[in-house]
Amino acid sequence: MKKLLLSLTLLVSCGAFAQEGPTMGWSSWNTFGVNISENIIKKQADAMVSKGLDKVGYKFINIDDGYFGGRDKTTGQLLIHPTRFPHGMKTVVDYIHGKGLKAGIYSDAGHNTCGNYYNGDVIAKGVGLYEHDQQDADFFFKELGFDFIKVDFCGGDGPQNSERLTLDEQERYTAISKAIENTGRTDVRLNVCRWDYPGTWVHDVAFSWRTTHDIYDGWASVKGILSENLYLTAYAYDGKFNDMDMLEVGRSMTAEEDKTHFGMWCFMNSPLLIGCDLTKIRTSALELLKNEDLIALNQDKLFYQPYVAKKLNGCYVLVRDIEELNGKRRAFAIYNPEDAQRHLKVNFADLQLGGSVSLRDAFAQAELGSFEESLDVTVPAHGTRIYIADAEERLERVRYEAECAYISDYQEIRNNQSERTGVYENADFCSNGAKAGWLGYSEKNDLIWKNVYVVNDGEYKLTIGYISGENRNITLHVNDAKIQTFSVNSGGWQTVGRRTINVQLQKGWNKVRLSNSSNWMPDIDYIEVVKVPTAVSPLSGASSEAGKDEIFLLNGLKMKKQNKSSKAIYIKDGKKYIN
């Protein structure tokens, strides 16, 4: 089985490709807070190189809050802290670049930083980007040469700044993005730190965006962040990424928890910013952070976040394509958030893998051999297993869960009911334990599957699993064409109904969209897509006498219909169809 490897050659000689992956590096905040210095930053850069982290893809040394020294009262020029960085910031940036690394910086979308409000860093008052967007962007990226910026929002969130200044997130981050663009730099990575998923607009202005509140060094934090990100699959695409926050690997969690933390951050295409002190990192943590199989998954050229394929015995089975869309090679993870070990059987058909399947253990970086039909596995409490799979066949996907679909107006900043924006909710009575709800009342509060793939064009049965205790309308669109509007009622808010409609799909990728522009839609559990069997006709000379079998041609194959029954059963692609 071919090893999944992110080699030095790939990282160094194919720089354009490497730059497209999630950001990999180190950030000062988790360990040092505002108590940073020129010496600390330089030592972390030294350690990144001496410990070989740069060789496996870690490139960024990011200076977070704590470097500010106020502003010049006449010119408004941003000043650097006189004692923490006595030689200014250009010296530090040049030092980082001299190591073959990239340099990152921090600011706030408002006047004041989070460190000013929460950490008593009084000198950091008025140092945010607000009213200085272009001046600071020119300073950071043209004069100093930084390559990355994380922009916080304490200064724009009234309860988190002394001015009680409240700003609009979309307006501020769009303006900041424009200021960076105006510098002429096209390689600067903007990270939006609004703590919850800010809205679908962020994809157009940033390279990555935070999806939760700050991580802390503890299992409860990691578990909570994973829970928040399981159903954000649809929002990471085209080389833009959901940011699950900096890494706490190598601090106080158990070895198994560290593996889950790092492994799932890699598997879910989150940026990888180490947060521990690299000069004191444990050997075991360093080895984990340098796992090339996991890093290769994180930096895979498709840059698609995995989706939850199955929930089994309290565990989540997530899967994604790697290297090639809809190919025979996939990766899957089994994540156990529970406080006890779990035994489960993963059926390869649920992962669209057919025939003999060869597996590689990404944590162990070892081949496991070939398996048929399923994998029996025990996952320890708080543990994760990640596999790279090569299958003989790629099966056609039938079910697409609603919690993996895209909501055009999705956001997590404001109350979704008052804003009339959809959400993803846990629901034990649904097929995979979750659903999409609070949909409708505008065309943008819709539900879209952009990745419905079929091998052949033609007529398909599209079944919608829905939940509604009253009559509600759905308008179905396929590939941007309106198909029909219909009313449904499942008879209760914990009962899943099914509505099937025949639609035409094109070979390859299709888009299925559900909407209701004037009222609430039902909650949605899933859609299923199944090919309608091609028309059949009796062979010349075949008997049609009652009680005799009739012989039919189906896709060039001889099939039998038993006349003693009023129904015919056809087998196509290993599936039964009744006519």
Sequence positions of predicted segments:
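Aromatic-lined carbohydrate-binding/catalytic grooves of carbohydrate-active enzymes
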Residues: 22, 40, 44, 48-161
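Glycan-recognition and catalytic regions of carbohydrate-active enzymes
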Residues: 273-338, 416-440, 448, 508
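Carbohydrate-binding surface patches
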Residues: 265-268, 273-275, 311-353, 382, ...
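Extracytoplasmic
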Residues: 342, 351-359, 367, 376, ...
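C-terminal tail/sorting-segment detector
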Residues: 569-579
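Sec-dependent N-terminal signal peptides
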Residues: 4-13
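Glycan-recognition surfaces
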Residues: 182, 187-277
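Residue-level detector of functionally pivotal "anchor" positions at catalytic/ligand-binding pockets or at interdomain
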Residues: 396-400, 530-557
